[in-house]
Structure formats: C-alpha cells, structure tokens
Amino acid sequence: MNFEIYTRSGCPYCTKVKQVLQGKNLSFSEKQLNAHFTREEFYQKFGAGSTFPQVLKGSVKLGGCTETVRYLRENNLI
C-alpha cells in the first residue's frame, strides 16, 4: 500500500502524517513544495485553497492529516 504525500517545509501536520505512516510501517513517497511542484501545480491538482499536507493513495485523494488518519482508522490500518 503506497501513499503519496504533498508537503511543504515547516508544516507540523505534514510531519505528523509522515510519523503516523512510518509508525505503522506504511510506505509513502513525499513530494515537497518548490522541490517537486509549484504552488500553482498544487492548486491545480487539489483545488484552490487546499492546505498541506495532501495525501493520495493511488489515484484516490484522501485529504489532509485529519482525513488521512480517519481513513487509516476506518480501514483498520492504525
């Protein structure tokens, strides 16, 4: 099960969602603002006003930290 996390530096929720996934040995790749994508590309992908982090599981958009943790709980992954 692979997750893709869109992050920015200095984001505590980005750190938290990565810690949750790492704590359960769930694999993920990280894409960082300005290193892998621009803010404009981020808004095109997730919608204007979207916040960090944004998490995908395959092509499914899970949302931010809270939504991702909810998804993991509902699917008995944490």
Regions found by a protein language model. Name each.
Residues N25-E30, K61:
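Conserved beta-strand scaffold positions in the cores of enzyme catalytic domains, especially
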Residues T15, E40, R70:
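Alpha-helical elements of the RecA-like P-loop NTPase motor core of helicases
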Residues M1-L26:
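Local sequence-structure signature of Cys/Sec-based thiol-disulfide redox active-site neighborhoods
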Residues K57-I78:
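Non-catalytic, surface beta->alpha helical segment in thiol-disulfide oxidoreductase systems
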Residues Q32-G49:
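Thioredoxin-like thiol-disulfide oxidoreductase module
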Residues P12, F37, G63:
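Short alpha-helical
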Residues F46-L56, C65-T66:
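Structural micro-motif
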